[in-house]
A protein has these predicted regions:
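Acidic, metal-dependent phosphodiester-chemistry machinery of nucleic-acid enzymes
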Residues: 1-383, 388, 392-396, 401, ...
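Active-site-proximal structural scaffolding
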Residues: 383, 387, 417-418, 428, ...
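Phosphate-binding active sites in nucleotide-utilizing proteins
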Residues: 383, 394, 403-426
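Beta-sheet entry/capping signal
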Residues: 402, 423-425, 430-434, 501-505
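Short, flexible loop/turn elements at secondary-structure junctions
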Residues: 407-411, 426-428, 439, 506-511
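Active-site beta-strand-loop-beta-strand hairpin of nuclease catalytic cores
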Residues: 426-434, 438-444, 691-701
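A solvent-exposed, charged loop/short amphipathic helix patch at secondary-structure junctions
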Residues: 443-461
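Acidic, metal/cofactor-coordinating or nucleic-acid-engaging core segments within structured domains
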Residues: 458-492
Length: 753
């Protein structure tokens, strides 16, 4: 290893890894022969893995029979889920909900085990955890080596669909909670509210009761754990006190055996305290399955709901021991716990993975009503909800925007007039947003990695929606006077001369994070009719972004930077919020990557500050965590706020340029603004500066300071100056901002030509 300050290099001959600050680059320089040998070895290894996993799983299952099923599941759940919200970092957390689920599924293959040992110690837990992790490592290698097995003859790299299959399976295997719980709760309550009465009569509970029971189960177990911890702490204090009293010759304990106190008194106070803590720690974990499990009556008391509702809920969301297929051994991307995350035995119930419970409500209820007459009503409700919520979120950010829903327009095709629809249209300054919403979800075969179903579902959920938005965009661009009919029958006429940018948005109800963060990788599937890709985002991510955006122009700028990722086609992130977190921290600039020699670039996690913020505002975290935001100086904030508040067209041209500036350029711009304003204040003369930016469009920017001039005269002066300078310099674009130094504010006129 070669270490030099912030640079670390690991060179293993044919494999090289370099860390430069927060960035990690991996490169290989295998010869063709080395590559062929590697593929052949991986292909051979791939064939052996299923049997290896089966053998390990059988041995592991035999080991599990010596434990009480509820106890061992509770221990592994505790180990993998307990976090400190004050210090939690997603990328540092070694536990996994998937480990708990796999253990539970293995236990559910068999009848409930009462166990042969009465106490599960830490060594038992570590061995159990190690066995699970070992099987998951094998499973990961099975899917990593799959392409080598498929291409052991031609040695070709994985195809686009093979890559998407791998990502889909890995996401389904490992990733849980693709949104924040309070957002999901709001979505569930609003989505199923119109069906509450029908649900109540059909399944015995409504959506509000379902959400209350999810909270009730978590609260019941949490309160029990806290109470046991409190008792352990109190006992530690009391027992140590009595040991000290015993040493002084005073022993009047009725609570603890004298033999115990006598033994502890032979130790130093520090050693006695350690011994007591170890013993009470063991007591805390004794019978952990009883703490984690509950009866319907106990849950009814905790949730303050009738026992009939409790039983109906548990009946729908529970699995019994012996219900899992006897052949199950390899961790699967799709499994029954994802829709029925509660297990039961002898009238006691347990939720091994609390993270699954809230997320199971929607797919489980959809399973129940799928083949019912209620399904069509639900589909309509679901689509309307997604459209309404999406437009509301965008409207909350773009406060001065004009927002329209469910528009109709007509196109002539083959001498026929055909009616088409557009889910949403937003007019914001000189920008149009054309929005299509898809409320459906990935099918189970697609989640399992079925190539044909992945292609079919992506086409249905993203490509078809995008084609509809493209059709509307083409209608606007190719029609002299585009006309839309609104839902109330009124007519909207689009004045094309006012718009410089058009964004196409595809919004889904279901997270599609295996595909949408690097949508350009789906182009080779042939599902898109146009090379121009949309911003495809799920409702949960859209909500976070809209809640964290500081001002309207920032959302427009984020869209421009985000869509640039598709154009560059080299960078990739785990999910949309990593892109947004990177934008807030570093601006989402990857223009230099194509010149770097890298053929692939992946972001690490950028959601830590977002997690901290939501933990804090929801009371999970006590330590203050500010809302994540871009570092923007007060002068730039003032410029942007005044431009946005001007009420004049084309201010987005200028705010976008200001946001596009690098830190160095912003510092220079601020310095010159201050200098020229002071000069004009001092001598009363006109002072200005001009800077040039070579971005996608070559732009000249002038800031002019005057004294004693009115706004309209200043605007005319800026326009004349900009037109002249644009012609003289052959720049494609010219922007000018005017400041009257004897008035409040920084922006009193602006032009863009």
């Amino acid at each position: 290893m070669n270490k030099n300050k912030d640079v670390e290099t690991f060179d293993f001959g044919i494999f090289r890894m370099e860390r430069n600050g927060r960035f990690i680059a991996i490169s290989t320089n295998r010869s063709k022969e080395d590559h062929h040998r590697l593929i052949s070895k991986l292909a051979e290894y791939h064939k052996t893995i299923p049997l290896s996993i089966k053998t390990k799983a059988e041995k592991f299952e035999h080991l599990l029979q010596k434990f009480n099923s509820f106890d061992i599941i509770a221990h592994i759940a505790f180990k993998n889920t307990i976090i400190n919200p004050e210090t939690y970092k997603e990328y540092l957390h070694r536990g996994s909900f998937a480990f708990i689920e796999y253990l539970t599924l293995l236990c559910l293959k068999h009848p409930f085990s009462s166990g042969k040992v009465c106490f599960i110690n830490s060594l038992d837990v570590e061995k159990t955890q190690a066995s699970i992790e070992d099987i998951f490592r094998d499973t990961l290698w099975y899917y990593i080596s799959e392409h080598a097995f498929n291409h052991k003859e031609d040695y070709l790299p994985p195809s686009p669909i093979e890559n998407l299959r791998f990502k889909t399976i890995i996401k389904e295997l490992y990733v849980r909670n693709p949104g924040y719980p309070h957002h999901l709760e709001d979505t569930l309550k609003t989505l199923f509210l119109p069906l509450n009465e029908i649900l109540k009569s059909k399944i015995g509970f409504n959506i509000d009761e379902a959400v209350s029971l999810v909270k009730g189960i978590a609260s019941l177990v949490e309160n029990r754990l806290c109470e046991r911890r409190r008792k352990a702490k109190d006992s530690e204090t009391q027992l140590l006190k009595e040991v000290i009293q015993y040493k002084k010759g005073k022993c009047n304990s009725n609570k603890y055996p004298e033999e115990v106190i006598k033994t502890l008194s032979m130790l130093s106070e520090q050693d006695a305290k350690k011994k007591i803590r170890i013993c009470l720690g063991s007591w805390f974990f004794f019978g952990l399955g009883l703490i984690h499990s509950f009866s319907p009556k106990e849950l009814a008391e905790a949730a303050t709901l009738p026992i009939e509702i409790i039983k109906s809920f548990l009946n729908i969301f529970s699995l019994s021991f012996g219900s899992i297929d006897a052949d199950f051994c390899i961790p699967a991307p799709i499994h029954p716990l994802k829709t029925q995350p509660i297990i039961y035995h002898d009238e006691r119930y347990m939720c091994p993975s609390f993270s699954l419970l809230l997320w199971a409500i929607k797919p489980r209820l959809e399973e129940i009503i799928k083949n019912d007459s209620l399904w069509k009503s639900y589909e309509k409700v679901r689509k309307n909800y997604l459209e309404d919520e999406s437009l509301k979120l965008l409207g909350n950010v773009l406060k001065e925007a004009k927002i329209y829903k469910n528009l109709k327009y007509k196109l002539e095709k083959d001498s026929q007039t055909i009616n088409f629809e557009l889910d949403g249209l937003i007019i914001f300054d000189n920008t149009l947003m054309l929005i299509e919403c898809k409320a459906g979800g990935l099918s189970s075969p697609a989640r399992r990695g079925g190539p044909d179903r992945i292609v079919r579902d992506l086409k249905k959920l993203i490509a078809e929606a995008h084609a509809q938005a493209i059709r509307a965009r083409n209608y606007i661009s190719e029609t002299s006077e585009p006309i839309f009919e609104l839902s109330d029958g009124k007519i909207l006429t689009i004045d094309k001369s006012k718009f410089k940018s058009t964004f196409l948005l595809t919004i889904t109800l279901e997270p599609l994070n295996a595909f949408t963060p690097a949508l350009y990788k789906t182009k080779e599937l042939g599902i898109f009719e146009d090379n121009d890709l949309p911003w495809a985002v799920c409702l949960f991510d859209l909500r976070v972004i809209c809640e964290l955006i500081d001002f309207p122009s920032q959302l427009i700028h984020y869209l421009k930077r985000r869509l640039r990722i598709n154009e560059l086609g080299i960078a990739e992130a785990h999910d949309e919020l990593d892109w947004f977190g990177q934008y807030l921290k570093e601006g989402l600039y990857f223009e230099e990557l194509p010149k770097s020699g890298l053929d692939h670039y992946r972001l690490l996690s950028y959601t830590t500050e977002i997690d901290d913020y939501y933990f804090y505002i929801n009371g999970v975290r006590k330590t203050y965590a500010p809302k994540p935001s871009q570092k923007i100086s007060n002068i730039f904030k003032q410029l942007i706020n005044e431009l946005e508040g001007s009420g004049k067209l084309n201010y987005l041209d200028i705010t976008n340029l200001l946001l596009e500036m690098s830190k160095k350029d912003r510092t220079e711009f601020e310095k010159l603004v201050k200098q020229q304003r002071e000069r004009t204040k001092s001598d009363g003369r006109i002072h200005d500066f001009t800077l040039f930016y070579k971005q996608s469009i070559q732009t000249g920017v002038t800031f002019v300071c005057v004294k004693g001039l009115d706004n309209s005269s200043l605007e005319k002066m800026l326009l004349d100056y900009s037109l002249r300078k644009k012609e003289q310099t052959n720049m494609e674009y010219w922007i000018a901002i005017g400041n009257i130094v004897n008035k409040c504010g920084l922006v009193h006129a602006f032009v863009s030509v």
